[in-house]
């Protein structure tokens, strides 16, 4: 499972860089873990070149095109037989079960499904495997005659699965009578902080988008002992903020320079991120933390992005090979839709009660100010599995 987490986290960084290219100056927020799990359901029925390309993009085959030293690559090959499709999907089964375990300290609602035109019936073996490994049931629907009705039904299902938080995942023109197969993936997250911010300390402050432009935000504030890490190249400050029970953490990577976000994004690799956020790099400080209160709801049509990353054949009517899914010819993936929703506020969740803690700085621990008043990167990690659940960029309030 460790190696699967490595693959998913590497995919998160690759995908973030691709999304950043087409979203300059815009916020980014997505769940690489959830997208990976959804695509793995499709990979389960892929064969030949189609399967190989998907495995490469999803970093299941980490021996090609990965920037890392030979020793670490050798170690990864030893710990995970990446050519073994069965092992990959067994690991997903374990991972999904671990991450989605019922928990009173955070809400994580997912909606993952594959919808295929009914004239392309699924193999029984494929249906059984998807249910076993992913707890999902691919749906055969009538895109040819009732595409808009199907779109509305999909949106209603996603809304129910996410308790009303994710609405209208599929836009009016997202599917039509020529649609063969679509993958829908939506995720809603809300957690309770270990140390909550006091509402009375939240004030309006300027958020500096660049050196000349700023926008007002509701800036939260707390004084607390927190874990800080320093990044030297490019210069940035990192912070770990635990959610209650410490199952999850929010990491913030704040460039020293107001205009330093792009440089930081380009510098990040899987190995560097692992190094920066390792326990050895963490130091406890008395932190005066200023963090914007924000809500992000981002939607993505991932077809062009995934194609540009190398997953081309899956979207091609003439080249796609999903013979492990259906015996019908010309079945291909029409699109992959993803939507993720997160709220960052004082308590961390609407239902949280009680007051936050405030400390006086008397112990011999160094003090530092962490003022997230300009663009930063952030991600939410499931600590037990070391999985990046969400990855984001906040640069435009």
Curated annotation (Swiss-Prot):
UniProt keyword list: Cytoplasm, Nucleus, Protease inhibitor, Serine protease inhibitor
Name by which UniProt lists this protein: Serpin B10
Main location: nucleus
Motif residue range(s): Nuclear localization signal: 74-77
UniProt-listed Pfam families: Serpin (PF00079)
PANTHER family: SERINE PROTEASE INHIBITOR, SERPIN, SERPIN B10
Family affiliation: Belongs to the serpin family. Ov-serpin subfamily.
GO cellular component: cytoplasm; extracellular space; nucleus
UniProt-annotated location(s): Nucleus; Cytoplasm
Record-linked InterPro entries: Serpin_CS, Serpin_dom, Serpin_fam, Serpin_sf, Serpin_sf_1, Serpin_sf_2
KW Nucleus (keyword) present: yes
GO function terms (MF aspect): serine-type endopeptidase inhibitor activity
SMART domains per UniProt: SERPIN
Site positions per UniProt: Reactive bond: 362-363
Functional summary from the UniProt entry: Protease inhibitor that may play a role in the regulation of protease activities during hematopoiesis and apoptosis induced by TNF. May regulate protease activities in the cytoplasm and in the nucleus.
């Amino acid at each position: 499972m460790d190696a699967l987490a490595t693959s998913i986290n590497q995919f998160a960084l690759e995908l973030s860089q691709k999304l950043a290219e087409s979203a300059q100056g815009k916020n980014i927020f997505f769940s690489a873990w959830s997208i990976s799990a959804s695509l793995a359901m499709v990979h389960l029925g892929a064969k030949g070149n189609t399967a190989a390309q998907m495995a490469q993009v999803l970093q299941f085959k980490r021996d090609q095109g990965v920037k890392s030293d030979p020793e670490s690559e050798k170690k990864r090959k030893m710990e995970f037989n990446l050519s073994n499709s069965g092992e990959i999907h067994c690991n997903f089964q374990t991972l999904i079960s671990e991450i989605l375990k019922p928990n009173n300290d955070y809400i994580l609602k997912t909606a993952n499904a594959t919808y295929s035109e009914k004239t392309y019936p699924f193999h029984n073996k494929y249906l059984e495997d998807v249910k076993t490994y992913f707890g999902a049931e691919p749906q055969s629907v009538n895109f040819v005659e009732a595409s808009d009705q199907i779109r509305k039904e999909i949106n209603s299902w996603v809304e129910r699965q996410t308790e009303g938080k994710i609405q209208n995942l599929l836009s009016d023109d997202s599917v039509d009578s020529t649609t063969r197969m679509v993958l829908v993936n939506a995720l809603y997250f809300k957690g309770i902080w270990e140390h909550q911010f006091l509402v009375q300390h939240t004030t309006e402050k300027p958020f500096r988008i660049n050196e000349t432009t700023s926008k007002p935000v509701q800036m939260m504030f707390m004084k607390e002992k927190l874990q800080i890490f320093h990044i030297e190249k490019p210069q940035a400050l990192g912070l770990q903020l635990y959610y209650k029970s410490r199952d999850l953490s929010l990491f913030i990577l704040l460039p020293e320079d107001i205009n330093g976000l792009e440089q930081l994004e380009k510098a990040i690799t899987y190995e560097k991120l692992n190094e920066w956020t390792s326990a050895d790099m963490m130091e406890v400080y008395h932190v005066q933390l200023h963090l914007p209160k924000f809500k992000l709801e981002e939607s993505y049509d991932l077809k062009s992005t995934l194609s540009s990353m190398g997953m081309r054949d899956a979207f091609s009517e003439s080249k796609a090979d999903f013979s492990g899914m259906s015996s019908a010819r010309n079945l291909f993936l029409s699109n992959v839709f993803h939507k993720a929703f997160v709220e960052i506020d004082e308590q961390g969740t609407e239902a949280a009660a009680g007051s936050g803690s405030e400390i006086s700085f008397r112990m011999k621990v160094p003090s530092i100010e962490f003022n997230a008043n300009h663009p930063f990167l952030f991600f939410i990690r499931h600590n037990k599995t070391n999985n990046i659940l969400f990855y984001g960029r906040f640069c435009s309030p």
